[in-house]
């Protein structure tokens, strides 16, 4: 086996070992053997549930800009009501 394939195989093995070894430290509350301490997890789930409940409450925003009624809006409403009356009369 040449020098380049040996170096490449060594680099691949080193990369895999470093990647697998560093993954254990990023886990939350992992003890040896893969066991977890449940108490901190329950607390964090309760905190997340409270945050979700707060986000689920509707927020009411008030518009501070006063916009006068548009005559086109009034005309549109009048035309819609006329069309509804005509279609209602034709159905009878």
Curated annotation (Swiss-Prot):
Similarity section: Belongs to the GnRH family.
Lineage: Eukaryota, Metazoa, Chordata, Craniata, Vertebrata
Species annotation: Cavia porcellus
Modified residues (Pyrrolidone carboxylic acid): 24
Keyword terms of this UniProt record: Amidation, Cleavage on pair of basic residues, Hormone, Pyrrolidone carboxylic acid, Secreted, Signal
PROSITE patterns: GNRH
Biological process according to GO: negative regulation of neuron migration; regulation of gene expression; regulation of ovarian follicle development; response to ethanol; response to steroid hormone
Residues at the site labelled Cleavage: 26-31, 33-34
Subcellular location: Secreted
Protein name: Progonadoliberin-1
GO molecular-function terms, A-Z: gonadotropin hormone-releasing hormone activity; gonadotropin-releasing hormone receptor binding
Domain of life: Eukaryota
Cited function: Stimulates the secretion of gonadotropins; it stimulates the secretion of both luteinizing and follicle-stimulating hormones.
GO cellular component, one term: extracellular space
The keyword Secreted is assigned to this record: yes
Modified residues (Glycine amide): 33
UniProt site (Appears to be essential for biological activity): 26
Cited PANTHER family: GONADOLIBERIN, PROGONADOLIBERIN-1
Signal sequence interval, chain numbering: 1-23
